[in-house]
Structure formats: C-alpha cells, structure tokens
Amino acid sequence: VHWSAEEKQLITGLWGKVNVADCGAEALARLLIVYPWTQRFFSSFGNLSSPTAILGNPMVRAHGKKVLTSFGDAVKNLDNIKNTFAQLSELHCDKLHVDPENFRLLGDILIIVLAAHFAKEFTPECQAAWQKLVRVVAHALARKYH
C-alpha cells in the first residue's frame, strides 16, 4: 500500500487527538448495537441486552480500548500493516472464528465515531485517508482467512 505524505499527515495528525478509551468504547458499543449478530463473539461480556446495557458495560469499554489501541499500531506502522496484524489475524481466524466482514463493519463504525468527535477536522480528504486505512487494516486482519 502506498501512502502519500498528505495521507500520512491526515492520519497521524488526527490520531494524536483521539481519546483511545472513549472512541474505542463507543466504536465497539456501536458495532454491538447496530449489528447485534456480532454480540455472539462477546458472550463472556455479560449483559448486552440493550443499548443502555452495552454502553454501560465495563468489558465492552475495556475491549473497545484494546481494539483501538491495536489500531494505533497500524498508525505507527503504516508501511507494514500486514505484518503488524499477522498474529491478530491468526487469533481471530483460527481461535475466535470471527467473520472477517466484521472487521470492515468496525472500520466503517470507527469512521462514524471519528467524524462525530472531530467534525470540523474530519474533512473529506481526512475521511478518504482514514477510509483507506480502515480498509487496509480490515484486509490485514482477514489475511489468514484466505
């Protein structure tokens, strides 16, 4: 994947302002609420019976932070995303059996969360760079499935 200097700047510039705990929790909660079938991968998280329960669930919050923290590894390794996510791809494929389509869904939700949090800064150019990034990350996570 080739990244222009502008794309790298748009991604890293915005990432430096992201509250990983809050945005990660919101992104995962939105995934579980908007796409309820994804809840089956989180049966150990306890009460996911309603949007209120999901939004208030500390395990959702903690895992959302973990997910977005690992997404930060992509931002730090833009030129080596495939290898950065090799182990996570293996885990999600071989042990967790997560449908790789869910990675794309989460990426799309992350875009929505970023747009909501950074409305003015999240220009069309910024969105284009981030859409590219979430596609590349989703592809890297789905790599072991092929």
From Swiss-Prot:
The keyword Iron applies. Keywords: Heme, Iron, Metal-binding, Oxygen transport, Transport. The keyword Transport applies. Belongs to the globin family. One of its GO terms (cellular component) is blood microparticle. This is Hemoglobin subunit beta. It comes from the Eukaryota. Red blood cells. CDD domains: Hb-beta-like. One of its GO terms (biological process) is hydrogen peroxide catabolic process. Coiled coil: none annotated. Residues 2-146 form the Globin domain. One of its GO terms (molecular function) is oxygen binding. Involved in oxygen transport from the lung to the various peripheral tissues. InterPro entries: Globin (IPR000971), Globin-like_sf (IPR009050), Globin/Proto (IPR012292), Hemoglobin_b (IPR002337), Hemoglobin_oxygen_transport (IPR050056). Heterotetramer of two alpha chains and two beta chains. The gene is HBB.
